[in-house]
UniProtKB/Swiss-Prot annotation:
Belongs to the DAN family. It comes from Danio rerio. It comes from the Eukaryota. This is Neuroblastoma suppressor of tumorigenicity 1. InterPro entries: Cys_knot_C, Cystine-knot_cytokine, DAN, Neuroblast_suppress_tumour_1. Disulfide bonds join 38-88, 52-102, 62-121, 66-123, 85-126. Its main location: secreted. Keywords: Disulfide bond, Secreted, Signal, Tumor suppressor. Residues 1-19 form the signal peptide.
Length: 183
């Protein structure tokens, strides 16, 4: 009985690994009552810098449970490696400049920090790089801070495909290049 279950598992996982370069898995045959989920949850993020007054901004964090599995391999290898890893991570983001008041600092009266705002999250490959297509890059300079778009209310569990965008006016924004601080 155990060998039969293992054989079925190997067959199911082998078919899944052949389906697409990296298909999102919402359910596994061994756990039909469990499903993957990934949501963008509202948070308050504190943006700070040494010598500056920290600012609180509304942002989102990705939270969820996505599937991963690894089936023991053989040597020499008789089948494709049966390893899959998904993680709940941003599917769509935008960048904005947050200006901090540093009136007590000798270096500068203010510092601009580049902050990633999360719009949507989804289960995606653990090996996904942040520069991959699907990221929405919009940089909002501090001069137009009052015109920033608000975060959408709806959350999505599927990847949102967007295009890389950057206006010429964004190139004029001053960015703080120091290592990010906690928070």
């Amino acid at each position: 009985m155990v060998m039969c279950v293992r054989a079925v598992l190997v067959c199911v996982l082998l078919e899944l690994s052949r389906a697409a370069p990296h298909a999102h898995i919402n359910r596994l045959a061994l756990f039909p009552d469990k499903s993957a989920w990934c949501e963008a949850k509202n948070i308050t993020q504190i943006v700070g810098h040494t010598g500056c007054t920290p600012r609180s901004i509304q942002n989102r964090a990705c939270l969820g449970q996505c599937f991963s599995y690894s089936v023991p391999n053989t040597f020499p290898q008789s089948t494709e490696s049966l390893v899959h890893c998904d993680s709940c991570m941003p599917a769509q983001t935008q960048w904005e400049v947050v200006t901090l008041d540093c009136s007590g600092s000798d270096e500068a009266p203010r510092v601009d920090k580049l902050v990633e705002r999360i719009l949507h999250c989804s289960c995606q490959s653990c090996s996904k790089e942040s520069s991959q297509e699907g990221a929405l890059l919009q940089l909002y300079p501090h001069e137009g801070a009052q015109d920033l778009p608000s975060l959408p209310d709806a959350t999505h569990t599927h990847p949102q495909h967007a295009h890389m965008q950057a206006d010429q006016r964004d190139a004029d924004a001053h960015l703080d290049m120091h290592a990010p601080e906690a928070g």
